[in-house]
Amino acid sequence: MAIMRVNPTRMELTRLKKRLQVARRGHKLLKDKLDELMKQFLDLVRKNKELREKVEEMLMKAHQDFLIARAVMSSEGLEAALMLPKQSISLDVSTQNIMSVEVPVLKFTTSSSDESDIYPYGFASTSGELDGAILTLSKVLPYMLELAQMEKSSQLLAQEIEKTRRRVNALEYVMIPQLTETIKYISMKLDENERGNITRLMKVKDMMLEQAHNFKEKLNEA
């Protein structure tokens, strides 16, 4: 791991030690966030799978009923029955926060609270299979919106997981090792400088003692 290009001073050493503390703290927080994101994501994927199977089953039933209705009714009669719906739907889109990720919340309201208004026709000229298909589609709509909400949430969480994982890896495998190695390097340099200073001081001391000894000998000779 390459060290940073810094001056090997005590001030720089103190600064880098503080950066290392912050990096380790940030790494722990991001790792905890990543673990929770993964937990939320996997739970969402499991629920999404179960809901998708339910929606597909209901849509398959509605499709089969429509096929039977088409077989027993004329094309003109089927088109006329479905031409003028009694209900309209309003979709409300909001968001909720999951681990700092804004995910969609989809809710709908109908223009009428009368459940029979889902049928845009009279029952005299239509088949029971068409009624069943309309009823199934009416029931499956909330699940389809929930499924769309889950799939978009899963996509957004997956993106956040990838982004968080890159940040965790950058700290764990690049920044923290680089800071650690640079701190070791500066500490080693400072130790070398200190040993060098001690050696120089010892030499100066020896020289002063030698000069004092020589001066004393000259005085004795005089």
UniProtKB/Swiss-Prot annotation:
GO terms for molecular function: ATP binding; proton-transporting ATP synthase activity, rotational mechanism; proton-transporting ATPase activity, rotational mechanism. It comes from the Bacteria. The keyword Transport applies. Transmembrane segments: none annotated. GO terms for biological process: proton motive force-driven plasma membrane ATP synthesis. InterPro entries: V_ATPase_D. Keywords: ATP synthesis, Hydrogen ion transport, Ion transport, Transport. HAMAP family: ATP_synth_D_arch. Belongs to the V-ATPase D subunit family. Produces ATP from ADP in the presence of a proton gradient across the membrane. This is V-type ATP synthase subunit D. It comes from Acetivibrio thermocellus (strain ATCC 27405 / DSM 1237 / JCM 9322 / NBRC 103400 / NCIMB 10682 / NRRL B-4536 / VPI 7372) (Clostridium thermocellum).
